[in-house]
């Protein structure tokens, strides 16, 4: 005779199941579980007197050496939030990669087992917890090495950007200057407990100028107006990107000195381009850079300073711009330059375009107008705001915001991975990919992950007083853990380089210890490749006098948010 359990009691033991909804932090968003791949009555619960014991949920006979389906780690009964779906499953990890997603346990006594829990398997209790893929930030100024910890604080596990420290060039532009600095930066990040990729400086009128940086190990190219965003620089950078199969990103000409947005689009010549802070407050043709989001070949992203649009956004942006771009408040032309980039109309429209899926990615612009520790948080704040402003998306309903949730999680996971040619490795929770995962308590979702797993090992997470008798006493802080220590970093973290540098032995040439992987498949991408964020308006019009934005003839705007979720309730200081 089967045992009937009260639904509430079941959820308290094993976490929610199909049809149950989970609130994300203090937002207005609810994730509804679409399916449950575990087997009811045979859940792989760990703990005293529970299931994962020898001969019960743990196989007494299968060895890791003899059976490739024996996992190194099981995350049991987890709620997975990914662009691929919102569902419940056990996650099996082996050799740092996702081995299986479904039911983990002992096939000798359990039904429908997808991977085996053996004597060599570690356990993380995922009951009632949310698992997402590690976040990817494609717009990071490498000003301080401490940025790695700030990123991990919000579940960001991969950084792409450029720079050499607090030099003025780095404070303005996310690009690495030359082969010598590229080599030094590859060595500098070799022990950093996070994935890194470097972006070459896309300036000059010969592709060879950019190409030498790609050959030195850069994994992408960035043109920035502070170094000159001319048509020639764009065209030659794209030529180098096409030759070496790396992504090309651009921060366009705010002052319209070398041409207008139409000239820049012509310089793209139909090639794949990642446009940074596409709204324009972070930089770009004033006032109409956002029209590039209507181009099929453009992969558009936003940055955290303008998302979501709030009552204090405009005031903050002016001072950010002055500092980041080495401007002098005593020079009227410098002040005018900063003011030209700040437009409430385009910032309001940007929120809506993100919600429509016309803007495909979210990035930080870290320490140069944005905050690397807010990428995930800002995404979910924006999603919650847009639910209030625009209501449920098509297919969503009360206690079911799955379509909106999947759209927004894609903005900082799978889409950046696709954009920069690393989606074969990371960016989603799929079998065969590296296990870069975040585990969240739902009430802290989007703010502070309980654990950050890098290539299958806990690298960062919540831990209590090291001198206490338990792991839980205060002070409970986010701390670096064993995956971030010693030579483990060589296996838990990755540096991405160009295929050329990989093939020509950059790891051996520079004596690097980290895992080195090549980027690829970046040059034939279009907006259609952006998962759940591929809406391409037929027309985007920005009035040069009023800055009003129209999409396919319809005015697009929203009010500044007076308050936001995921704020002071979670961050007291």
Curated annotation (Swiss-Prot):
GO terms for molecular function: nickel cation binding; urease activity. Binds 2 nickel ions per subunit. Keywords: Cytoplasm, Hydrolase, Metal-binding, Nickel. Transmembrane segments: none annotated. GO terms for biological process: urea catabolic process. The modification N6-carboxylysine is found at residue 222. It catalyses: urea + 2 H2O + H(+) = hydrogencarbonate + 2 NH4(+). Residues 134-573 form the Urease domain. Carboxylation allows a single lysine to coordinate two nickel ions. GO terms for cellular component: cytoplasm. Its cofactor is Ni cation. Ni(2+) 1 binds at residues 139, 141, 222, 365. It is an enzyme of class 3 (hydrolase). Belongs to the metallo-dependent hydrolases superfamily. Urease alpha subunit family. Heterotrimer of UreA (gamma), UreB (beta) and UreC (alpha) subunits. Three heterotrimers associate to form the active enzyme. This is Urease subunit alpha. It comes from Limosilactobacillus fermentum (Lactobacillus fermentum). The gene is ureC.
